[in-house]
């Protein structure tokens, strides 16, 4: 998110300060300012602990991040939506688990957008997401 804030300019940081804190799993929208997009949807992913009933609360909150961001995008007539892999950085979600949660939501809404993109940081992340997609596809086909 530091890269996004530095590229967007100080207006984005001020817009976020004006909004204030949001709850884990919630999402809000701001202008894109100096970014090559009309808007930025912000969400707060949970920290993964695995200790709360095997991480169920965290998993549900992670799904909420995607779901709430998508609902805001639909409400604002966004036709292209890009996500990063939420929760996998400092929030410590295992990449496979995060990918599975994200894909369950993203696949449900894929027809709502002209482009629905996930930006991944590395080839190894792409392999994990592709494996998660294959597993989800097999599970839904059965």
Which residues does each predicted region cover?
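Phosphate/ribose-phosphate-bearing ligand recognition and processing surfaces
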Residues: 48-142
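Glycine-/small-residue-enriched capping loops at alpha/beta junctions
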Residues: 1-75
